[in-house]
From Swiss-Prot:
Protein name: Gibberellin 2-beta-dioxygenase 1
PROSITE patterns: FE2OG_OXY
Organism, as annotated: Oryza sativa subsp. japonica (Rice)
Reported cofactor(s): L-ascorbate; Fe(2+)
MF annotations from Gene Ontology: gibberellin 2-beta-dioxygenase activity; gibberellin 3-beta-dioxygenase activity; metal ion binding
EC number(s) given by UniProt: 1.14.11.13
C-alpha cells in the first residue's frame, strides 16, 4: 500500500473541536480547546509513514488513514455498503433470521451479554469465507453467494491494509521482527471479525423499538428532557469502550457520531468529535496491541453518539490473533525503567474476561502486574 517517493512530506493533522466530556449519567459539562488528530498518508515515503504510524499510535492510539487505496467510491466498498444497507432496510422479521447475536449474527440494541445497549442494529461476522458463507444464508436468502462474495472481497482488502499498517508500525517501533504483529492476524486460526453498525436517524432523539424486533420504520420519539442518558444533544449509539483486539479499521459514511477520549494540549482528557470522512479509514489501537507493546501504544477509548437526522453506517474490521495465541510484551519493550506491565495471557482467556464484563470496563487493568509482584522480574525474561 505504501508507494515510495523522493521526498518526505510533512505530517498532516486535523484539528477538531472538543466535545463535552461525560460528567455524570444525567448529562455532560462543557469543554473547550482544540485537539489534533494525526492524519497518515499511506502513499507517502515508507520510512516517513512508519514513523508517523508509530507516533500516532503512541500518542493517542488513533489516526486518520488516507491514501490507503480503499476509498468509499471504490467498488469493493460501495458494494458492501449497498448490500448491508439493503439488509438493514428489510422488515424486522426478515432481519431476525440472522439473529440473535450470540455474539455473531444480527443484533439490535443489545451489545454483549451484560446489559449494555445502544441506539443501533448491527451485523457481526467472523472474517473467514466459510463462516461468512454460513451466515449469508440467513442474511440474504435470495442470493447468499453474492453476499458472501461481497463481504469476503471487502475483508481481503481490509486484511491487506491492516497487515500493511501493522508492518509499518513494527518498522516504526524498531522491532526485531517488524512483521510480528501482522503474522498474528494472518494465522489460519486468527479470530478476525467484521462488524457493520447501522444507527437510525436521531434528530428528534429516537429510540429503537426493542423486544427483539428492531423495527426501524416504527421508531418511537422521546423528548430530550426525558432522556437520562442524553449526551451532547443525542443518545448513546454505542457506549464508551476500547477495542479488545490488535487493531481496528473503521470506515463510515458522511454522518458524524464517533468520539474519542484523548488529552487536549494541556493534558486533560476529553471527548472529541471526529469529523466524518467517507474517504478515510480510522485506525484504532486495541487492548492486545497495548499489551504486546508493554503499554507503549494506547488502546483508545471511544464511543458513538447518535445525534444526526440521517442514518450512520459504519464498517469495522477487527484484526485479531488466534484464540491459542499467547499475548506477552515483546522483549524489546521491557527495560529496567519500564518493567513488564501485564501478565501474559491467551486471546481466548482475554475474550472470556471481556464477555464477563460491561462494555466500559477497563479490561486490561485486570491483567496488570503489581509493582511488588515477584513474577515481574521472571516474566521480563520471556
Amino acid at each position: 500500500m505504501v508507494v515510495p517517493s523522493a521526498t518526505t512530506p510533512a505530517r498532516q493533522e486535523t484539528v477538531v473541536a472538543a466535545a463535552p466530556p461525560a460528567a455524570a449519567a444525567s448529562g455532560v459539562v462543557g469543554g473547550g480547546g482544540g485537539v489534533t488528530i494525526a492524519t497518515v498518508d499511506m502513499s507517502a515515503e515508507r520510512g516517513a509513514v512508519a514513523r508517523q504510524v508509530a507516533t500516532a499510535c503512541a500518542a493517542h492510539g488513533f489516526f486518520r488513514c488516507v491514501g490507503h487505496g480503499v476509498p468509499a467510491a471504490a467498488p469493493v466498498a460501495a458494494r458492501l455498503d449497498a448490500a448491508t444497507a439493503a439488509f438493514f432496510a428489510m422488515a424486522p422479521a426478515e432481519k431476525q433470521r440472522a439473529g440473535p447475536a450470540s455474539p455473531l449474527g444480527y443484533g439490535c440494541r443489545s451489545i454483549g451479554f451484560n446489559g449494555d445497549v445502544g441506539e443501533l442494529e448491527y451485523l457481526l461476522l467472523h472474517a473467514n469465507p466459510a463462516a461468512v458463507a454460513h451466515r449469508a444464508r440467513t442474511i440474504d436468502a435470495m442470493d447468499p453467494s453474492r453476499f458472501s462474495a461481497i463481504v469476503n472481497e471487502y475483508i481481503e482488502a481490509m486484511k491487506k491494509l491492516a497487515c500493511e499498517i501493522l508492518d509499518l508500525l513494527g518498522e516504526g517501533l524498531g522491532l526485531k521482527d517488524p512483521r510480528y504483529f501482522s503474522k498474528l492476524t494472518t494465522n489460519a486460526d486468527s479470530d478476525c471479525l467484521l462488524r457493520i453498525n447501522h444507527y437510525p436517524p436521531s434528530c428528534n432523539i429516537h429510540k429503537l423499538d426493542h423486544d427483539d424486533q428492531c423495527n426501524i420504520k416504527s421508531l418511537v420519539s422521546t423528548k430530550a428532557s426525558n432522556g437520562g442518558n442524553l449526551m451532547a444533544g443525542g443518545r448513546i449509539g454505542f457506549g464508551e469502550h476500547s477495542d479488545p483486539q490488535i487493531l481496528s479499521l473503521l470506515r463510515a459514511n458522511d454522518v458524524e457520531g464517533l468520539q474519542v477520549f484523548v488529552p487536549d494540549h494541556e493534558g486533560k482528557e476529553m471527548w472529541v468529535q471526529v469529523p466524518s470522512d467517507p474517504s478515510a479509514i480510522f485506525v484504532n489501537v486495541g487492548d492486545v496491541l497495548q499489551a504486546l507493546t508493554n503499554g507503549r501504544l494506547i488502546s483508545i477509548r471511544h464511543r458513538v453518539i447518535a445525534t444526526a437526522c440521517r442514518p450512520r453506517l459504519s464498517t469495522i474490521y477487527f484484526a485479531s490473533p488466534p484464540l491459542h495465541a499467547r499475548i506477552s510484551a515483546l522483549p524489546e519493550t521491557i527495560t529496567a525503567s519500564s518493567p513488564r506491565r501485564y501478565r501474559s495471557f491467551t486471546w481466548a482467556e482475554y475474550k472470556t474476561t471481556m464477555y464477563s464484563l460491561r462494555l466500559s470496563h477497563s479490561r486490561l487493568e485486570l491483567f496488570k502486574i503489581d509493582d511488588d509482584d515477584s513474577d515481574n522480574a521472571s516474566e521480563g525474561k520471556a
